[in-house]
Amino acid sequence: MEEYRGELLAPAGTMDCLKAAIAAGADAVYLGFSGFNARTSAGNFDADSLKEAVRFCHVRRVKVHVALNTTVYGTELAPLADAVRAVAASGADAVICQDLAVAKLIGEIAPELPRHGSTQMSVHTLQGALELKDLGFTRVVLARELSLPEVEAITRNCGIETECFVHGALCMCVSGQCYMSAFLGGRSGNRGSCAGPCRLPFEANPLPEGRPGRLHHLSLKDNSVIDKLDRLQAIGVASAKIEGRLRTPEYVAAAVNACLAGREGRAYDRDLLKNAFSRSGFTSGYLDGKIDGTMFGVRSEADAELTRKTLPALRELYRRERSRVPVKMKLEIEEGGEKLTVTDADGNRAFAYGDAEPQPARTDPTESLQRSLSKTGGTPFAVEKIDVEMDGGPWFVPGSAVNELRRTALEGLQQKRETLRPWPVQEVELPPLPQRTLPPHRTLRARFESWDQVPEQALSGLEALILPIAQADRVPRAWRSKTILELPRVMFGALEADTARRIAATQEAGFAGYEAGNIAHLRMCRGLPLSGGFGLNVTNQLSAQFYADHGLNAILILPEVKDSDIASIAPVQNGQPVPTGVIVYGHMPLMVTRACPLQNIHDCAHCDKTGLLTDRKAKKFPVRCGMGVRTIYNPVPIYMGDKPGALTVDYGVAYFTLETREEAAAILDSIRQHAPFEGEFTRGLYFKGTN
C-alpha cells in the first residue's frame, strides 16, 4: 500500500487557478463562496460555478474545501443560510468557517457536512483545538505563528486533524485579531476585504513630528517551510496548505510543484519558486522558532521583473492534464464483438461495446491490445491493470476500434464521477432578528492594562473593573468582587500553561470572574463565571447566542459592528437577557503580533518594550511588548462618552491601555458626565460600519 503523505491543499481564487493546482498535482483545493469568504477580491464561486468546480475536482480525486470564513452581520444571516444550502448541494468536502454563526447554521442545515476551523478563529493552543473538537469540528487550521514543537503538541493531542500553512504570504497580525484595515479604511480583514495596510510604510525608527515613515517594518516575507514537510508529516499534520487565493495560476502551480517535490524528498527549483512570487526571499522563522528582524521584507521591482521573465517556464508546470485516477480495464472479445469494462477504486464502472467483427489472429494480440488501451494521455485516468479475455481466439481487432472502446468507456466513467453527491439538508427557519430598545440604565465598566492606571476612586460609578489576570495579585481583596480578570487573547508558548495556573490560583480568591478573548478560554474556564471580550469577534445574534448557550454572562460586541446591527444582538440565557456591551473609549488594539516590528531597528536586549511606528501620513502608532506578543494601537482613541443613547447595549467599556492614572480618572469623569472629548478622537465604525 502506498504510504499516505498527507494532503497538499492549494488555493483556488479562480477556476484557472483551480485547474492549475490540479494539473500541478494538488490533492485538494480551497475556494471562497461569494460574499462570505476571507478573500472577497478573489474570483470566488457562486452556487453554479461551485458545482462546476466540484465536478471537475471529484472526477480527478481532488477534494474541495469551501471557505465561508468571515464574520457575519445580522442582516446577512438569511443569505448565509442560503450559502450553506448551496455548499451542501454541491457535494463539496468541507466548509472552512470563522464565525460560530456559520458553524451553527451548518450544524442545523447540513449536519453531516464537515466543518474546519479557519485560521481566522485564532486557534494556536491545545485547549483551543480541543474546544473545536468538542464543538464538532473535524479539522483546525492552526495559526501561522506556531513553532514546530507547538504544532506537534497540538497535533498529537487534539484528536482532530490539523492543517498548517507551508508556503505563502504572512499576515503581520495573528489571523482573526487584526482590526487595522477596518479602522484605518473601513475594509475589514475579518470580512475578507483587508486593504493590506501592513504592506505600506510603517517605520520603527524614531522620527521627528511631521516626517512620514518610509520603511516597511510591518511587512513580513512570505512563509516557506517546504523543506520541513517531512517533519510536519511525521508529527501527524493532516494537510499542508499553500496560501494565495489572490495569486495567479502560475504561482499556484509553482508552489504545488515545489511542495510535491518537498513531500517526496525530491529536489525542486528554488529559484523558480522564488521568482513566481517573493518579497525579497522567504522566511521559516515561525516554524523554526527564530523570530527576528530577518523575517521582514518587501516586494521590490526586481522581484516583479523576475516574475514577469519566469512566466513562460511557470506555465509549463500546468500545461498538461495529470493522469491521477487509477482504473482497471477488462476487454472481452468473442466472435460477435467486443466489450470493455472500466472500473475505479470508488466503485464506479463504465462499459463500451464494439461492433467491429474480430478476425482470427496469427499471433497472440494481448500485448498490442494492452498498449492501445493504456493510452490515456489527456484524460484524468491512469491504467493500473488490463485483463484481456478472448473466447475462441486469438482475435485481431483494429487499433481504431480499440481506441474508440477506450474513449467511450472512459467518457462514461468520467460522467459517473461527475455526478454530484449532495449532503442531506434539513429545513431550518431562522428566527426574526431581535430589535432591542435602549435599556433604562446603562452601566460602565473600565478595563486597565495595569493596576498602576487604576484611579483611587475607580469603583465609584463603575459596574466592574477589568484587569489582565497577570495583575490579579495587585488587586486589593476589597475590590475583587467587582474585578473581572481578563485572559490573554494570544497565549503562545508557555503562556497557555501559565494562564491555566493563574486561573486555578484565582478561582477562590474572591474575583467576579474572567473575560474570554479566545475560544480556548471556554474550555479553560468551564463552570466558572465568564464574560466575552472583543477578541471573540461577536458580530451577530447567532454567534452571541452560541456564547450565551456556552455560559458567557456578558458579551462585548466587536467594535467593527454598526449601530443598527448592534441593536439586533440580544442573547438570552435561561430566559433572561445576557448583557451586551461596546467599547466607549479606548485606543483600539489594531494588531497583536508574534514577530516584533521593533526588531527592524534593535534586538530585544536593547529595547524597553515600547516604541512607535510612523506611517506614510506621519501618524504615530504606539507599540507595546509583553506576554510574548506586541500590540499596535490606534493613535486616536474611540470616544462615545457624549453619545450615551447612540448604541443599544447594556454596558460600555472604557478600555485603558496607554493612559496614566490621572488621564484615566479624567476620561472616566467625562464619560460619566456625557461630556465632549478634549482632543482628537474617532467614533470608530459604530456609525459607518465596514464593507
Predicted regions located by residue number:
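A cross-family signal for key residues in well-ordered alpha-helices
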Residues: 104
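Surface-exposed amphipathic alpha-helical tracts and adjacent flexible/coil segments at the periphery
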Residues: 1-24, 28-39, 53-54, 60-88, ...
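Glycine-rich, highly charged phosphate/nucleotide-binding loops
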Residues: 45-50
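Active-site PLP-lysine loop of aminotransferase-like
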Residues: 124
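Conserved non-cysteine loop/helix-boundary elements of the Radical SAM core domain that shape
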Residues: 40-44
